[in-house]
């Protein structure tokens, strides 16, 4: 000892005297680099499903659209899509409104816009036929020169304007916009079969031909309605006979006669030069001007034309279009269904002293010579002039943004899975998808979507939501494919074989035949005795009973009853479970819903954070982690109960079906019918029980998922156990006593839960993961897990109340119902008890050596030392304490 003291003193004299507050460069080193390297472990989000959405514009119909997601073979793929964003394109029409003296009402030429061909179509126009012999596709225009004087053509024209021309249909709620346009908008090359691409006109007289050219020359979108007197007062007020103006007479007897009478008959009131001269001398009529305004003027902005929808006037004759800059339009929202009609109450009749109407010509004349003689001999001086035209575009949209059911059926969605991300060719056909599609992916690869076969008159975006399962499926594969499915398949086969053997058994057949005979005899005797009041329902019921029992003993009995009756129960369990479950890993695996659950609760990050909390013994987080882990184990046991409940229910159904021949025979008689009814109720209870159990289980699982994320907190790399180096030399009579921490190693580094201390600001804030919030959340999590563990007993009671099928009582205990699932779980617990006890040994060692720190037991007087055996009695416990414990 003296030598040691001397060495220490020598060192102290050699080095500089050290003080408690002195520091050295090596002490300033820190492990912040490690902290930055490991960072923090965040609480994971449960993302077993990869979800996203895409909007497919109908303008890209037929083209595959990438989702950017990959799918795995055999895993769930869900696609939901909606056409809520799809609306009808505005219906577009080009309308040419023209006054022709040969027709009592205005001529209306209508073109319809075809969105699929991106052009207007002049449909139903008379005397246009496709020229199949021509090298240039198109149509032959109406023949105005050859065979022009044709009563047949006149008849066709009359019918066309009367009822055969294209109609513009308007529905209530439609928004109608009508705008005036130039003739160049109407006569365009983008017209089906090149019909009405140019003005229809002829330089010769053709009484039966149709014309579109303006009869006011270059002055378009104008109407003239003026008496001969007003016209002549403008162009020849003096009535000079030396001027070939065409005017004659004065006052009300004034007449106007075109130099070329033949052209006047087909809608040309004046020679082109005279028309231009006249139009240059007059002005636009004042607002709200009526007929025969003085002096003569022209009507524009839609005046002189009446527009109706379903008989309701939407623009009066004297009403002008709204003018905005260079545009003139009228806007209207329809209040009723109907046909849009362009007309006027200004009459063409009596423009000439003799009729120029086509309808009169074909009725009055039998041949062309008499018609020509009529034309040449009569005076065709006009009493008034009524000519002009309007060119318009009509756009009709639906204010409700709705599309018809027929249009909806033409919108389809397809999906395609490819091995690489290369854009598939549009010619490749995909798999059709309904509005709520759910199936297993047929192969691995990239997911593509597209819209096909949309109508040409719709626009908008098809909204598609899609999701695919990305978690593991090992548990359901083991449980269902490895255990449950072999059992259910075996019991299906057993049920079928047992049933067939029963109906082929001679004793069973004799019982069935005897029961039928006895039933008919009793029925006949009761009928003869008059004790039976027969109704139509009673007769039908008895006949059905006899037919069912008679069919029961036939060879095709199993095929018939299994198809139309037994399958309701055997497939009903799977059907209800499949439709109740929302999230599942596979549609073909009815227990696929367990995979997302196990994927959540076996997440490595979750258990890693729980392990980190287990290390926090000093602040109580270890207790919270223990509660959470025990709760999860309890919940896993509840999952096992659900699986066992399904197996027992299915076995019960198959056993009841195998005994069906006995119970079906019992339905004949009233005394035994109750057994048949109980049999049906039992079958129904077996179907309902796993369904209700699963519903409750999934509801609790939703709550558990939220609570688990609150129990587990993020952990960051920090000091787990602080390390302090102390130096105390007072025992050596040296006045030195201090301690310090090494900056580069202040303690044992590891992840530490990020839990704030409780203070006034967060004590009542549930969003802050304080110790109080964690503790209460852990207790709630434990309570919910206990609820899931007791679901089987609760569901048995509920099903018993619904179906009147009460579980059997435990022998010697009338109050307690027997629970097959509980019995199975108890047997499993008995088998696993040794394993559980063995697993508790390390925990006992940890408690005894670390927490209680009982390294060596005290020796009793006259006793022996501690045996060091785990299950031996403690020697450090007095007999008095043992008595208290006992």
Curated annotation (Swiss-Prot):
It is a multi-pass membrane protein. The keyword Coiled coil does not apply. Keywords: Cell membrane, Membrane, Signal, Transmembrane, Transmembrane helix. Its main location: membrane. The lineage of its organism: Bacteria, Pseudomonadati, Pseudomonadota, Alphaproteobacteria, Rickettsiales. It comes from the Bacteria. InterPro entries: Conjugal_tfr_TrbL/VirB6. Belongs to the TrbL/VirB6 family. GO terms for biological process: protein secretion by the type IV secretion system. This is Uncharacterized protein RT0029. Pfam families: TrbL (PF04610). It is found in: Cell membrane. Residues 1-20 form the signal peptide.
